[in-house]
Amino acid sequence: MVQGNNSFRELPINSQFRLENSPQGNNQRFLRFPLNGKVNGLLPLADLRGVIQVALTEILPVPQVAEFLLGIMNWRGEAIWILDLACLLGATHWCRREGVRNSGMAMLVQVQNQTVGLLVEQVNTIEVYDPQERLAISASMLPARLGSFLQGYFVDSQGSPLMLLDTHVVIQALQPL
C-alpha cells in the first residue's frame, strides 16, 4: 500500500488556481505576462505548448535576420526560433534594456507545426476571461505596429488593460524565413 504524502497540505493555495476560477461556459484560460512596466499581456493557453526558462547563452544568434529574432535554440531535439516579444512589438531590444537579464521565460507557441519561443522577462498567472468581454483596440490607443499583433484587450479587476496577443500574427512575422 502506498502511503500518502501530507506535505501538500503545507503548500499555500494560490487563488488563481482554485476550482471557482476554472473555465465555465465560454470562458477561456490565458497566461498573463508583463509587456512592459505598465502593460500586461495575455496569451491564450490553447496556443501554448509550454513555458521554459532560457539563458541567453543557450540561444545561437543567426546573422542577417530581423532584430527581434534573438536566434535559435534546441528544445527537445527541435530547433526553434526565440524572438524578443517586446522588440517585435516596438520596444527596446532585450540586450539594450536597462538592467538586462541573462535569462528570461520563453512562452512556446505552435501555429501550423512551427514552434516559436516568445521571450519575456517573466510570466505571471493563469487567468480566466469570457471572450465575449474582449474589447476592440482603437487606432488612437496604441501605435499601429503594436496593435497589429493584438486581438483586443480585457480589463482586469483593478481596471487595468490586458492586451490579448494574436499568436497567428506573431508567427506570420517569421514567414520570410
Annotated model-derived regions:
Residues M1-L177:
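An acidic, low-aromatic, low-complexity terminal/linker signal
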